[in-house]
Amino acid sequence: VLLALFCLSLANVPSTFAADSPAPPLSALTFRMAGDDLRTRIVVMFDREPKLSTRLFGNPHRLVIDLPETRFGFDEKSLEARGLVSHVRYGLAGKGCSRLILTLRGPFDVENLRVLKNENASGYRLVADIVATSDRKFAEKLKEQKGKTGSTERTRQQVAGSALPGDGKPRPFTVMIDPGHGGIDSGAESLSGIKEKNLTLAFGKELRDRLSHERNIKVLMTREDDTFLRLAERVRLARQHEADLFISIHADTINQHDIRGATVYTISDKASDAVARAMAERENKSDSLAGALPEEQPEVTDILLDLTRRETHTFSLSFAEKVIGELQGQVNLINNPHRFAGFQVLRAPDVPSVLIEIGYLSNPEDEKLISNPEWRKKLADRIALAVKAFAARKRPSNLSGG
C-alpha cells in the first residue's frame, strides 16, 4: 500500500510536463560501504537529488530504501558483504519505483541518514550510518514505525516476528562469556599440543554452568562450539543481547616461559607494559590470521557516546578489581595482575568488559593447572563470586526491559 502511494505520488506530474519528453530515470552511480560489525556507513552517489523513503524490517533484519525509477550503475564488487551488511539487492519494485535493500547481520538502527549535495562535483550523495543495537531496541523501532505508517498487515507481521520489549518482569543481570578464538583460529598452543581455543571453550562452559546457579543472573556465550567469530562480531553479540558484563577468556603463550599466573585486562589506548601491548597486538590480529580482512571503521565523534564510554570504563575497572580480589590467595596471579591495553574485543562503548588470561600455556606449571578440570572449577567459583558482587552493585538500569 505504502509503495503504491509512493509510486503514485511520483507519477502525478502536471499534464503540461507530461506532454514533453519524460524525465530520465534517476541514476545511482556508485555504492560504497565501510565499517565493521558494530557500525557501518553506506554512501550512494546519485546524478541528482533523490526523493526517497526508508523502512526497517525483521526476519531477516533489513533496511529498505524506496526510490523513484532508478538506473543502478553499481560495481558488483562494491556490494560484497562488509561490516553489518550481509547482502545488497536492488532493482525495479513497480511502475515508476525502484528499491535498494540491505540485509543486516542482526538488529540495527539507522543513526544518521542524510542526502547531501556534492561539494566538488555535480550530483548528490546518500550517507547512512547503521549501528548494531539490541533485539529489544530494534523491536521498539519497528513498533514506532508501525505507529507512523499505519496498521498494515505487513508491519504487524514484522513486529510479531521480532523480540518485543519486556513484559514488566525484572530484567536479569546478563553476562556474556566469550571463549577466545575458535574454528580456523586456534589461538596459542602449548609445547604438548594443547590448543587455546579448546581450553577457553571448556572453561567458558564451566563458568557458564557455575553462574547459572545464581538467581537473577542470565548467562550467554559468544560461541558454544568450535566456531570462528570476528572480534567485532563478539562485541556485537554482547550489545545485541544488552549484556551488563562481557568476559573474554584466554590462555596465551609468551616468550618468557617463567611468567605464569592469571591476568585481568581492561581496555586502554596506552598499554600498561610491554607484555600487555604484545598481547593486545597478537589478539587483535586474530581476524587477519583467520583470513578475515580488517575493515575500516567510520570515524565517530559523539559527546554522549564518549560519556557512555567513560562510565562503562569505570565499571570495567571496578569489576577487574573485584576479580583480582577474589583470586588473590586462591590461584596464582601474575605480578601486577590488573593490566590494560587496546584489545579490540573490549571496545563496546556500553558494556563493561574485561579479558581474563587464566594462565600461560607457555609455562609448564600453568599448562598443568589449566588442563585440570578441578582447578578450572575453583577458578570459575572465584570469578562467579566477583560477578555476583558486581551484579549486586550494578543492576540493569532498565529493570522492566521496556
Residue ranges and their predicted role:
Residues 16-174:
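Signal-peptide-cleaved, periplasmic/extracellular N-terminal interaction regions immediately downstream
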Residues 53-55, 74-75, 184-188, 274, ...:
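Short, solvent-exposed loop/turn elements at domain surfaces
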Residues 146-300, 309-322, 368, 377, ...:
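Catalytic-core regions of hydrolytic enzymes
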